[in-house]
Amino acid sequence: MLVVKDKPKSPISEAYRTLRSNIQFSSFDKDMQLILITSSGPGEGKSTTSCNLALAMAEAGSSVLLLDCDLRKPSVHKKFKISNNIGLSNVLAGQTKFESASHWYSQNLCILTAGKIPPNPAEMLSSKRMKAFLNEAKGVFKYIILDAPPVIAVTDPQILSTMVDGVVLVVSSGVADIEAAKRAKELLENVNANIIGSVLNRVDTESRRGYYGGYYYYYGDEGEKVKKHKDR
């Protein structure tokens, strides 16, 4: 659900804006232009987070590129109800240009869907063309948000995490277990990923706490809350 667009005054929309602000503040010592969103496993809400974060950044006046880098099971196009006939995979394969494949959803938000599912997603995402594409995008957009596959499922997020400035890990209390979340964190740390924070979804708000273990919690509706690391 695109709550930032459909319910702009809801608590959860404000939570995404807070996440946006925290990411911006985390760039005080280092540029935080390329941001990877992933999860430990499927169904945890990483694509929903990517889309709403992109909307929140765009509404603040920043130029944003949202990339669907889940070349195995893309979903960004479904959330925005746009075509996925051509996209990132086609651009990287040299079949089309970015300008022809991208969609300007609003004045500040540009979306590049995943495109045709390739036979070699990991190789495509780790290619020199992908690195060159991201480098070119940095010269055009203030923020580039990459919606990546789940960490434990495939190696794609680990590959992409070496190309970005920061990683946000999405974890669902109703889907992921503690060990899966820990394993995802370990896999990212093994490639020296810069994990700047996490988003915790589907939480029982009856047992919520304002502070816990060095994390801030931001509560929203529909049993969802966003959590962000304190200063590291």
Task: List the model feature ranges, each with a label.
Residues 48-49, 53:
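Hydrophobic positions on the alpha1 helix immediately C-terminal to the Walker A/P-loop
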Residues 59-65:
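Helical hairpin unit composed of two closely spaced alpha helices linked by a short loop
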Residues 6, 40, 171-175, 198-208:
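G-domain G4 guanine-recognition motif of GTPases
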Residues 145-146, 200:
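Hydrophobic residues in beta-strands of the RecA-like P-loop NTPase core, especially within AAA+ ATPase
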